[in-house]
Amino acid sequence: SEVFAKSHPNIKLNWIRDSTGIIAARVLAEKDNPKADVLFAMAVTSMTGFAKMGIFEPYSPKGIEKLNPLFLDGKKPAEWVGHYGWASAMCFNTIEAGKRKMPPPASWVDLTNPVYKGKITMPNPASSGTGYLMVAAWIQMWGETKAWEFMDKLHENVGAYSHSGSKPCEQAAAGEYVIGLSFPFRAIRLKEQGAPIDIVLAQEGTGWEMQTGAIMKGTKN
């Protein structure tokens, strides 16, 4: 928003930032009378459903031809455009783990080890896109039966569920928990700031998502 304000000083920007599930619910509630002009950095898994409802204004931004086709919806003009891709990851506090002689996890299954009981925090999949991404990935990798068995065991070790996908890594970085299930770029930023965390990508594989943007149909701005 700061960069936009500098390049467009005559435009007042009012923006609402929240978890994927919360924003998605708001978009659905306002679909017949949208309050927003632009939907920005929204999960493509949500955007494809919104596009089917016809709530976006088709628009191809300048330079769109330079983008990888994988970042586009394939329509001309486009209804949504991808910004970046991301994945899920574990944030492991090496200092707190050392105090408790806890081994670093290498896989998702490792998180069910009783040694981690109460020392894991993860995003709530009901409100967080990151949490939803993890659940979806586990089901895709293992099938529903095995995935839900895993999640039941994982739940026994989870000390807290957060509203957002970034908070678990922040909690792990602060030493509130040993392991925070989050995403890599939050972990990288915290690590660069000096947090004693290692970034772990699970051996079994990890879910990924793409953030996108679109213009709401009927916007006056």
Predicted regions and their residues:
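A ligand-binding cleft/hinge motif common to bilobed small-molecule-binding domains
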Residues: T45-G49, A173, Y177-P196
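Bilobed periplasmic-binding protein/Venus flytrap-like ligand-binding cleft at the lobe interface
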Residues: A106-P114, Q211-N221
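Conserved functional loop/turn residues at catalytic and ligand-binding sites
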Residues: K31, E176, T219
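Short, well-structured alpha-helical segments in soluble
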Residues: A25-N33
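Extracytoplasmic ligand-binding site segments that recognize negatively charged/polar headgroups
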Residues: S1, L13-N14, D18-G21, P34-E176
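A short alpha-helix/helix-coil micro-patch that ends at or immediately precedes a cysteine
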Residues: E2-H8
